[in-house]
């Protein structure tokens, strides 16, 4: 089994005894209330999905990630994982204190932050270095500018898990997926990330990858996404039906990716690959404009960024695929590498194009998506 990033799978979940100890003295602790976004980041640190991180970044790691895509110890890491609050809240907290973290929705106690450092979040610089733009029309940049200006760095202890309302049967921590892959006898596993329903281009990439590995981990993102993205429950329904009818059941595994979407393109592709390595995957499919939005990134920039590192530094193999299309002359899916015909014979597929058709009440053709998936999507759009 592939090693977790940094060599060790982090576990910051309190034992029952530790949890009771912290809760018994919770009234003596200062507390801060945070959003669901922050709670999910906390949980992903605690379960080891963000290994080797053991908490929210300190200034040294923050600076290093912005400037070199590495933690201060040299480990590759491309996205800042930050807990930030308004200055007046930060002023009440002292470095060295244990701070109780609550959910701002219901005041439930979720974690302890062992406050190591307070520092200013340089939002303009962060926007440029992570997202390559300071344009507030970019959803990741907009979200960044809405956050507090002071970052709180330090290790965490998770007291309670988030009580998710959906997909319980598809939620797996890295320790779970590693055990499952091992029990299945899979030595090589390819992960596929998506925030769209599976169309024929996705299916083509997944099945091409499945020819060279033991198993496919279909890992759709169910964290925070853009409002116009198709809801995760509709997408999950489409994944279940397509896996049931068109994939070999013993060679695929479906589990959700509980991470918030940042739309950081190339840098997010590295981050997504590292998370899948922590799940136990050996390969990761990187298609065109991975984690992109609008025209902020080049078509294959998310693939090219992997070339900036030695393969062993990231440790998971990126499978770089060109834009797949349906060729009317070949009568099959293909890419420019496998099809000799001109663009006039190519039907290009994208989640955006499918969404456009559905919003107009048009059923996507079979070259776009399987009929069963089209029906699920049509039903959703008709009931919107």
From Swiss-Prot:
Its EC number is 2.7.7.4. The keyword Nucleotidyltransferase applies. CDD domains: ATPS. One of its GO terms (molecular function) is sulfate adenylyltransferase (ATP) activity. GO terms for biological process: hydrogen sulfide biosynthetic process; sulfate assimilation. SUPFAM superfamilies: Nucleotidylyl transferase, PUA domain-like. It catalyses: sulfate + ATP + H(+) = adenosine 5'-phosphosulfate + diphosphate. Pathway: Sulfur metabolism; hydrogen sulfide biosynthesis; sulfite from sulfate: step 1/3. Pfam families: ATP-sulfurylase, PUA_2. It is an enzyme of class 2 (transferase). InterPro entries: ATP-Sase_PUA-like_dom, PUA-like_sf, Rossmann-like_a/b/a_fold, SO4_adenylyltransferase_pro, Sulfurylase_cat_dom, Sulphate_adenylyltransferase. It comes from the Bacteria. Keywords: ATP-binding, Nucleotide-binding, Nucleotidyltransferase, Transferase. Belongs to the sulfate adenylyltransferase family. This is Sulfate adenylyltransferase. It comes from Petrotoga mobilis (strain DSM 10674 / SJ95).
